[in-house]
């Protein structure tokens, strides 16, 4: 079994729990208000704006044995660069105040997640970044 399949298997119940959260169910049914969607986008902005800096930090902390990962990180950076601006554009399109979001602060859960990731990269295992990426990419 590949690592990806092992990871998918090991996290199946947690992913199922997440997908059954009331807000996710409402999204699946298209039963959310514009305000709720703008709130979601606002919090998404606060972590997405850190994706490229986190990837850069990850690449910088990897040992020589992970040189092969750096090329993939460079491609990932190129793919992700500017996505935070897409979110702000979506907020504007929904009638939200994108500049207030740009200059605002995240909620505590997003702040803690981002802080944990920077700490994990600097003091723990930089490859830990990819766990968060797997969760967020898998639910978006």
Regions found by a protein language model. Name each.
Residues 1, 31, 67:
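Charge-dense, low-complexity intrinsically disordered segments
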Residues 1-9, 91:
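Alpha-helical transmembrane segments of integral membrane proteins, especially early/N-terminal helices
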Residues 1-2, 13-14, 104-106:
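Short linear motifs at secondary-structure transitions and domain/linker junctions
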Residues 3-5, 18, 108-112:
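A short linear-motif detector with a strong N-terminal bias
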Residues 8-18, 27-63, 82, 123, ...:
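Alpha-helical bundle segments that constitute or directly flank the non-heme di-iron/ferroxidase center
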Residues 21:
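Short N-terminal binding/cap micro-motifs at the start of the first secondary-structure element
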Residues 24:
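His/Met- and acidic-residue-enriched segments that coordinate or traffic transition-metal cofactors
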Residues 68-140:
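Active-site-proximal alpha-helical scaffolds that flank and shape metal-associated catalytic sites
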């Amino acid at each position: 079994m590949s690592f990806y399949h092992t990871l998918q298997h090991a996290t199946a119940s947690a992913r199922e729990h997440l997908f059954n959260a009331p807000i996710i169910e409402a999204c699946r049914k298209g039963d959310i208000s514009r305000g709720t969607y703008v709130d979601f986008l606002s919090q998404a902005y606060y972590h997405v704006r850190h994706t490229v800096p986190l990837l850069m930090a990850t690449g910088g902390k990897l040992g020589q044995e992970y040189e092969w990962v750096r090329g993939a990180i460079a491609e990932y950076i190129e793919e992700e660069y500017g996505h935070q601006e897409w979110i702000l554009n979506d907020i504007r399109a929904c009638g939200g105040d994108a500049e207030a979001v740009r200059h605002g602060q995240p909620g505590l859960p997003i702040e803690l997640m981002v802080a944990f990731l920077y700490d994990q990269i600097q003091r723990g295992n930089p490859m830990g970044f990819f766990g968060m990426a797997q969760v967020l990419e898998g639910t978006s």
